[in-house]
Regions:
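Ankyrin-repeat-protein effector appendages
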Residues: 57, 90, 122-155
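Conserved ankyrin/ankyrin-like repeat signature
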Residues: 16-17, 49-50, 82-83, 115-116, ...
Length: 155
């Protein structure tokens, strides 16, 4: 399976085309050769209106690509704060792990995405989950981010 018209429109940020395709019955959870759904691309490229349309029409917020990454992994790594909020509002799993054992919080910490990391923790992201390298998000965090997150959790 390759890219569907919905994948292309979502990736390109074409709101009206996405809306029309959904209205015509396009499969919102279609996967391409990388295991990605249109929502993976909307999340990655910070296409907020498109993500909302997809989610409101049944897109799975926890869809996994071939690396077991979800749209939330992508948004957290890219530093798309509003997208992280949108996905969390639509019940994206906050402690879901990719093929390397990383949670979205690991990726946010690794990329120094302070606000995204704080938002994930405030929604229940664990600072204690170890990835395959036995690193927690706190060990991956750079600068003072680890201390900030630890204070949030431990008070």
């Amino acid at each position: 399976a390759g890219w569907t018209p919905l994948h292309i429109a979502a990736s390109a940020g074409r709101d009206e085309i996405v809306k029309a395709l959904i209205a015509k019955g396009a499969h919102v959870n279609a996967v391409n050769q990388n295991g990605c759904t249109p929502l993976h691309y909307a999340a990655s490229k910070n296409k907020q209106e498109i993500a909302i349309m997809l989610l409101e029409n049944g897109a799975d917020p926890d869809a996994r690509d071939h690396f077991e990454s979800t749209p939330l992994h992508r948004a957290a790594a890219k530093g798309n704060l509003k997208m992280v909020q949108i996905l969390l509002q639509h019940n994206a799993s906050v402690n879901i792990r990719d093929s390397e054992g990383n949670t979205p919080l690991h990726l946010a910490c690794d990329e120094e995405r302070v606000e995204e990391a704080k938002l994930l923790v405030s929604h229940g992201a664990s600072i204690h989950i170890e990835n395959k390298e036995e690193l927690t998000p706190l060990k991956v965090a750079k600068g003072g981010l680890g201390a900030i997150l630890k204070r949030m959790v431990e008070g």
